[in-house]
Amino acid sequence: MISSNGESESHHAAPKAPLRVLMAWRPQSTSDEAAEVAAWVGRTEEIRVRAATVIPRAWEIQPGAQEFQEYRNWVMAETQACMNAALSALGKAGLPQGMLAEEDPAVVDIAPTETKVLIKAAADFEADFLLLGSHPAAPRSRFRMGSTADALLHCAPLPVLLAPRSPKLAKNGVTRVSCSYVDTVQSHEALRRASDLAARWNVPLRLVAFSPSGATMYPTNVPFDDNSDMMVEWREQALALLDRGRDRALSRHPNLKVQLDVGSGYGWSGAINALKWKKGDLLVMGSSELGQFNRVFIGPSTNQILRHSPVPVLVSPV
């Protein structure tokens, strides 16, 4: 590198250490959504942010080669330019200077791929979240995965915070934590993290379930009757599991304000857009059951929600 618990609410009275966020910064980035989300979280509570950039390396140049000194000079110049750009984006987004990491607020490495380097950088920083921006082809206020995000969402050992392109964010930070809950082991872990964050920030927790209409969770050629007895039963089942989720959250944080909501609509887009979203919403989701223990792994349903969510999403490892 070139440098520039599961307790109940009664045990959270001690002073909290600032959340630590490793922001992945790409030198060719065309927008600053990752920096904007970092600053948004920083308006919620005091945090520490380190920017990490990986410069792709196509091949090795041996020290004795004629081009080595020229290459070394380029590396040093590019490293400084990347660190300056990342710190400038954070400053422009409104992150206070005091919330940058005390040591090495920006780091740069040169490697063939980004994934392993970012995971190691997050571990070195003891990060609570790994923050990623969207692919530039994403629609406004939506997230699309690039190759690095895709890889990290299938192997990261820590929560991954995803910033939608050109996000609309509340000036006073996170004002509500929403949690996609389906009463599985994976969503239990997401609920634990979501309820802890809501209690930490003293904001409401909203448990949400999505009920895409149709006989499957994807659009079909043959319409399905949304008013059928089956759809009514699905909604009742969703409300029942959300009730169980509320009980879990309140057993962990008895003073938490918990809201329940079910989004029903045609396909995933319709179901997600049926809910009312605020500029202060953070959506927390669990990983797929196919993932390794203590690793993020997104499945088809998670991917659909990521594509259509209009707010930043935190994907929690199992």
Regions found by a protein language model. Name each.
Residues 131-134, 159-166, 313-317:
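Short beta-strand elements of ligand-binding domains
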Residues 129-151, 174, 282-308:
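Glycine-rich, Arg-bearing micro-motifs that act as flexible, cationic patches
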Residues 102-117, 261-270:
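Charged docking surfaces used in two-component/phosphorelay signaling
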